[in-house]
Design a protein with these regions (language model features):
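Glycine/small-residue-rich phosphate/adenosyl-binding loop
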Residues: 38-108
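C-terminal helix-cap and adjacent tail motif
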Residues: 3-13, 25, 148-181
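A structural motif
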Residues: 26-34
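Small-aliphatic-rich amphipathic alpha-helix that forms the alpha element of a beta-alpha
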Residues: 33-34, 76, 94-137
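Short secondary-structure boundary segments
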Residues: 80, 128, 154
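Helix-loop element at the rim of GNAT/NAT acetyltransferase active sites that forms part
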Residues: 9, 35-36
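A short beta-loop-alpha structural element at the N-terminal edge
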Residues: 19-24
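A glycine-rich helix N-cap at a beta->alpha junction
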Residues: 67-75, 139-161
């Protein structure tokens, strides 16, 4: 699929049919995550790739409100490494350091979701969760801070694209404008 087509046809998936994902596809998705741009090449992320069916099925309620994820074959818990976060905060100040680490994670998440879509899979980015319950449920290291959960799998039906605001409403030019019509 051409990149522009991928961008225009990717959508969040919240209904899956259980089909295992090939190991090489899982590796390709995770590899896309580590290729994301990041602050000063600190690579502040760490990913937990969860394929254990029981852990996935029991994640609803224990981690986040995701009842629709019971049939997903892969959950990726995206974490920020505390040691790197602390270094970013020391070097750039607390607010900027945290923002850099969160932006790093967001870039990795976006890369992984796009790669999953490129492989014909669907995915969803799940935000805030109970961090302590997430760490306990998935066995996450004490010095890793969960920041998002991705569900990845085969869509139960073609994903529904949602409307977007017109480009002209989402952009303000500073300088010579470009016709966005």
């Amino acid at each position: 699929m051409e990149f522009a087509d991928l961008l225009n046809h990717r959508a969040c998936v919240r209904a899956y049919r259980y089909e295992p994902i090939a190991p090489e596809q899982i590796k390709a998705i995770l590899a896309a995550g580590i290729r994301a741009p990041n602050a000063c090449n600190y690579q502040s992320w760490h990913f937990y790739a969860v394929t254990d069916r029981e852990k996935i099925k029991s994640a609803h309620g224990a981690v986040a409100h995701i009842p629709w994820a019971a049939d997903v074959p892969l959950i990726i818990v995206v974490c920020i490494r505390e040691e790197i976060l602390n270094g970013l905060c020391e070097g750039f100040g607390a607010d900027r350091g945290r923002a850099f680490a969160e932006h790093d994670a967001a870039g990795a998440i976006n890369h992984m979701l796009l790669r999953a879509a490129d492989l014909g899979l669907g995915g969803c980015w799940i935000g805030p969760m109970n961090i302590e319950m997430c760490k306990k449920h998935f066995g996450i290291a004490e010095d890793h801070i969960p920041t998002a959960i991705l569900t990845i799998g085969t869509p139960a039906s073609p994903p529904r694209l949602r409307d977007r605001r017109p480009l002209a409403e989402a952009v303000t030019f500073v300088g010579e404008p470009v016709d966005l019509g």
